[in-house]
Amino acid sequence: MVQGRQAGGHQGGWLYDEAERITTFELLTQALKLSCVPLIASGGIADAKAVRDALMMGADMVAVGTAFLTTTESVIDELWKAKLLSACAKDTHLTRLFSGKLARGLVNDYLREFADIDGVIKHAQIPPYPELNAMTKELRATAKHLKDPNLMSLWAGTSVDKCRDESISELIDRLLN
């Protein structure tokens, strides 16, 4: 799996923060030079052009994530789904604030309030995963119960603007044509 910075949710682990800033296609180019195993491109892939581009570059497969969250078959919270359907790439941000592990999600009041101690921009010290994840578990559960998207972890990739209220079948058709 070759996952670029555009991917939503928790990111793959890296040894260096600079590597966390590499795009999917930059990372795929590097991986193709060094690897002889099948490669799956992931991150920012949510339309037919991105699928074609990744495959033409040499990826053996692609993984699509965020676009499936708004399908009619998805079981995510309706508030999260509504936020995804009205968002664009600039509404997403890499953060460690919910779990201690780098993840991309929609910016909300929680992320804005604690941006100074996020640890992504200023490398501040915050508890690592899984400690911070355990510390925020009750917050996330309460936010879901209260239907408060400003305290939820609303994971989303930068291709969020490609999300549609459609069936999985319609999404697959759109990805392939």
List the model feature ranges, each with a label:
Residues 1-2:
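A structural preference for short, pocket-lining loop segments at secondary-structure junctions
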Residues 5-40, 46-177:
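Conserved active-site-proximal phosphate/metal-binding subdomains
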